């Protein structure tokens, strides 16, 4: 399972309405879109994939262009799933001129 939480680090509040796309990275630099969801009022998407994950690489794309409060139009994170039975929580903290992400719990 992959989940996310998007926060406005400058104001200390969640960011609702952020479009997040999850894709699986396939051979030859192709991608297969798994889901496109929008963060809820608390800035969360509890489950980005309804299908079972496989070992491999995935891409999270956060579309920030509608926010108006950040320099970044979008943020793309490529991550590795080593164990599909584990949960992968990937928060994104957005500031006017910077972004931070990490593997949460």
What positions do the PLM features span?
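Beta-strand-dominated extracellular/periplasmic modules and repeats
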Residues: 1-83, 89-91
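Compositionally biased low-complexity segments at domain edges in trafficked proteins
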Residues: 87-105
């Amino acid at each position: 399972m992959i989940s996310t939480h998007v926060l406005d680090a400058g104001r200390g509040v969640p960011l609702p309405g952020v479009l997040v796309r999850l894709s699986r990275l396939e051979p030859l630099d192709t991608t297969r879109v798994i889901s496109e969801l929008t963060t809820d009022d608390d800035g969360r998407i509890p489950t980005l994939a309804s299908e079972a994950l496989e070992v491999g690489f995935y891409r999270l794309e956060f579309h920030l262009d509608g926010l108006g409060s950040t320099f970044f139009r979008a943020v793309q994170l490529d991550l590795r799933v080593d164990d599909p039975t584990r949960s992968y929580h990937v928060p994104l903290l957005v500031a006017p001129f910077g972004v931070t992400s990490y593997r949460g719990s």
